[in-house]
Each structure stands twice: as C-alpha cells, then as structure tokens.
Amino acid sequence: MGQKINPIGFRVGVIRDWDAKWYADKKEYVPALQEDLRIRKYLETNLKDAAVDRITIERTEPTRINLTIHTAKPGIVIGRGGADVERLRSELSKIVDTYKGQHKRVNINIVEIRKPDLNAHLVGQQIAADLERRVAFRRAMRGAIQRVQRAGAKGVRTMVSGRLNGADIARKEQYTEGTVPLHTLRADIDYSWDEAMTSYGNLGIKTWIYRGDAENGQFIKDEDVAAAANNRGRGNNRGRGNSRQNGGRSRRPRQGQASTQGRGGNN
C-alpha cells in the first residue's frame, strides 16, 4: 500500500496534520469547501513566485478565517511595511462569502520554511524551472538530489516522466539516494507532484524526501524539520573530521599522475 498511496495522505492523522481545520453542517459544508478552493486558487496565482509550500485554513468562528501560509520567501508575501499582506487580506475579504449578513474576517499568518531543500514541493518546483530552461533532465535531477542530501535528508527519490529531451516516445526515469521507507508510518516523508511546461509537452515530476522519524506520535512541523536537519548536519561533520584525523584511505593516483611520476623518477 505504501508504494501506491499518496505518502502525505497515508500519514494524515498519524504524524501529519490536516491542511483544512474546520467542521460544518450539511448545508454549510459545500459553500465552505468552495470558499476554500477560491482562497487557495487566488493565493497560488498571486504568490507563485513566493515559494509557497502549503496553505492551512482554520475556521474557529463562523465569521473568522485564519490562514497560515508556509513560504520560503516571507519577504515577498509580507512586502515593505506589510503592504502586500494587507492587500492580500483586503482582496480575500472580497472573495469569501458573508455569514448571515456579516462580513468574514480574514487573518493571515506567515510561517517561514527555513530548510527549502527539505521541502518536496519546492524541490520539485526547482526541477520544473530547470527543465523549462532546457536543462538536461538528468542534470536537473542529480543537482536536486545533491542539494537535498546536503540539507540533511536521510533519503530522496525523484522521478520525471514525459517526452524527455524531446523524444518521440514518452518514458520515465527516476533516481534514488539513501532510504525512503514508504511503508513506515512514523517516517516523515514529504511528497510532491509538480509539472514542467516545455515546448515538447508537459513533464510530470514526483519528489519523495525522507526527513527522519517522528517522535512520540507528534505532528511534524517546519521548525522541527529544520532543527533535526541541523543536528544531523553537525553530527556528519564531526564524523568526517574524526575519520580524517584517524587516517582514512587515501585515493589512488590517477594513471596520468602515476606515469608522470615515473618519468620524473627516471630522469
């Protein structure tokens, strides 16, 4: 099951929290859902350059909507002196419906993503941007994997499907580094599906990032991901330093270097 199902939906309620936190009666459910779709569509359209990962919508009262925007570029969303976020709030107030003649109040909270290279959606967007700039797909995928590993991930998998390099027959290729335990529910695996629009057609991009295990069944937060990655990075640096001091294996000289040394010795 873990190989087929969406990894995020598979872990909702276990280590992942919901993106929509509200409850409505039968008559109010459909209007509230349509309202959520309008809000998400507007924000995705107007914040496409702000590196937004996900948007959380919470309704604590019938006349209040709390939005939480997770972004790697909070300055673009907030703007100078908070002008842009105020403009978003006023525009969203016009989009949402009224409740019994009262206008709903929209509150916007901004959460910074401190480790964008550990976010599957942002990594997939970067691969899509590279493919749209005609970068070779293998180079784009390997570059993304290297960035994710340097950020402190335990495993990463990327897949690109479509007319790769303009081939007549569509195919898919994937690269995996480390481990990606899809069946383990406590494993914090971020997943994303993105799309690159090229002159040969659209390419699908799937990204899986294994960021570690959740502790005590708590929901994963962006702050926890950044802290865990920093701890793993410090541990890896200490390990590499000790291996150098103890004397690791030296690299074998290249053939060109060996022949040059031999000629020098004969002279």
UniProtKB/Swiss-Prot annotation:
GO cellular component: cytosolic small ribosomal subunit
Domain KH type-2 intervals: 39-114
A molecular function GO annotation: structural constituent of ribosome
Similarity remark: Belongs to the universal ribosomal protein uS3 family.
Organism this protein belongs to: Oenococcus oeni (strain ATCC BAA-331 / PSU-1)
Name the record gives this protein: Small ribosomal subunit protein uS3
PROSITE patterns: KH_TYPE_2, RIBOSOMAL_S3
Subunit structure: Part of the 30S ribosomal subunit. Forms a tight complex with proteins S10 and S14.
CDD domains in the cross-refs: KH-II_30S_S3
